[in-house]
Design a protein with these regions (language model features):
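Fold-level recognition of mixed alpha/beta catalytic cores in primary-metabolism enzymes, strongest
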Residues: 1-43
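Metal-dependent amide/peptide-bond hydrolase catalytic core
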Residues: 36-217
Length: 217
């Protein structure tokens, strides 16, 4: 499979700490509840993609952590949430980050809590250059046949450190299939079983790629 343009999304992480004021759970009016503020923040952050990002663009904001307290009868001082953001375009990535910061600041003011927000950019989006992608398409078609090459399928919301190479030089990230057998699972899956029959296709592809590239140089 070969993409012209975005292939894999960026992978960013964020953490937010909500500091309130602990109190006995039977007397919540004596404190500032960070759990309540955190729950409202989780819901509010879901509006970032839904109401800030152009529907024709793609972005994901997933909350994956919520930690607060360890007793049934105590409102804790602090709640912590965290998660991940995925996007393909740098401007969408920045837009999501800024919207999250704005919501965190406003939510702290609304509940009288102190909300700290930290956004950490990870792998950038993996974006193929068109010329190199079309070159790779031709080579793949020579090796496997045109019907075996998927062109511009839906990109992945995963992440890939090859993106750093593509920021420095034009290039192309390609996918090599594992075949239709039982071992064909998604990435990071314990049931994945590499199909040795795919090796000759991979080797032939890279050899042909070098031959064609040097011939055109």
């Amino acid at each position: 499979a070969v993409h012209r343009g975005p292939v894999i999304a960026c992978a960013d992480r964020f953490d937010s700490g909500i500091r309130g004021h602990g109190a006995h759970a039977a007397m919540p009016h004596q404190g500032i509840d960070p759990v309540l503020a955190g729950a409202a923040l989780v819901q509010a952050l879901q509006s970032v993609v839904a109401r800030n990002v152009d529907p024709l663009d793609a972005a994901v904001l997933s909350l994956t952590q919520f930690h607060a307290g360890d007793a049934y009868n105590v409102i804790p001082d602090v709640a912590k949430i965290g998660g991940t953001v995925r996007a393909f375009r740098p401007e969408i990535r920045a837009q999501v980050e800024h919207a999250m910061q704005r919501i965190c600041t406003g939510m702290g003011a609304a509940f009288g809590a102190n909300v700290h927000f930290e956004y950490r950019r990870g792998y950038p989006p993996t974006i193929n250059s068109v010329a190199e992608a079309e070159f790779c398409m031709k080579v793949a078609a020579e090796v496997c046949g045109e019907t075996k090459v998927s062109i511009d399928p839906k990109p992945s919301m995963g992440a890939e450190d090859f993106s750093y190479f593509l920021q420095e030089k034009p290039g192309c990230y390609v996918w090599l299939g594992n075949g239709p057998g039982e071992g064909g699972c998604t990435l990071h899956n314990p049931h994945y079983d590499f199909n040795d029959e795919a090796i000759p296709f991979g080797v032939a592809y890279w050899v042909r790629l070098v031959q064609r590239w040097l011939a055109d140089a």
